[in-house]
Amino acid sequence: VIGGDECDINEHPFLAFMYYSPQYFCGMTLINQEWVLTAAHCDKTYMRIYLGIHTRSVANDDEVIRYPKEKFICPNKKKNVITDKDIMLIRLNRPVKNSTHIAPISLPSNPPSVGSVCRIMGWGAITTSEDTYPDVPHCANINLFNNTVCREAYNGLPAKTLCAGVLQGGIDTCGGDSGGPLICNGQFQGILSWGSDPCAEPRKPAFYTKVFDYLPWIQSIIAGNKTATCPP
């Protein structure tokens, strides 16, 4: 996260850290004791999922590591379009218990409204050159825009996405924040998918997969319908 500050250790009990290699990691969001949501483009063959984590180099007493037991990506996702249906649901190999630094966030009950102030968070780059990664998650507030702002910035926008950032630039998610949550008015509304390169450019908000539009798919999979398909 560019232009933010260290998150309060108590504000992100639902935030998980997916580690694949020193060069490749993502954010994830715990939605119940056994399931996390992230971006499909964060998928790797081998993933360690840390929950209850704040400082990467120092373990919290209640920090735990889990692995994917099952992974679900929309069966109708366009394979060669990284930004299409950029959402992945992962079942943990063992449930987690709620503790000081671990608690799920519920799925949104309403879609977010344009103009909302939203919170971003993650262990991603804190410099636009993407050469400085923090030991602790950084948090910042950004604004939810009308999708036309992103359409103009990127000559288009995938369906079922949210467009969020700061028009003057300087505050944004960045490399390593992918898959992490966009929290608007206390509700988990988005999953970081893609943004400008370099990050935090003026008039180039990032886009986030719109969780609300995928609720039927998420709820079907969790209920045991493993073949559920996503909206087109």
UniProtKB/Swiss-Prot annotation:
It holds the Pfam family Trypsin. Glycans are attached at residues 98, 146, 225. Inhibited by diisopropylfluorophosphate (DFP), but not by hirudin. It comes from the Eukaryota. InterPro entries: Peptidase_S1_PA, Peptidase_S1_PA_chymotrypsin, Peptidase_S1A, Trypsin_dom, TRYPSIN_HIS, TRYPSIN_SER. Gene3D superfamilies: Trypsin-like serine proteases. One of its GO terms (cellular component) is extracellular region. Its EC number is 3.4.21.74. CDD domains: Tryp_SPc. Optimum pH is 7.4-8.0 for the clotting activity. The keyword Protease applies. Transmembrane segments: none annotated. Disulfide bonds join 7-139, 26-42, 74-230, 118-184, 150-163, 174-199. Its main location: secreted. The keyword Ligase does not apply. Expressed by the venom gland. Belongs to the peptidase S1 family. Snake venom subfamily. Monomer. Thrombin-like snake venom serine protease that clots fibrinogen by releasing fibrinopeptide A from the alpha chain of fibrinogen (FGA), induces platelet aggregation through its interaction with GPIb (GP1BA/GP1BB), and activates factor VIII (F8). PANTHER family: KALLIKREIN-1, KALLIKREIN-RELATED. This is Thrombin-like enzyme bothrombin. It comes from Bothrops jararaca (Jararaca).
